[in-house]
Amino acid sequence: MDMEDRDAAIANALEALHMNQTALRAGLEEVSTWIRQRGSVNVHDNVMATLEALDLQASSIASAIERLRS
């Protein structure tokens, strides 16, 4: 496997992980909103703060994919 193929394989794997992370984030946000609507604002706030970390990592993953594919 040459360097270009290796980079493409890594980019593909990262993209799949990124898509899974995005889907998990969306699901967690939905559940968190449901929890907030039932009175647990604290839990919702904690989940949303944690999801911000996922957002930061999502940016890094997207940048890495872009670099590998350029």
Positions of PLM-derived features:
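Long amphipathic alpha-helical coiled-coil
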Residues: 4-7, 11-36, 44, 48-51, ...
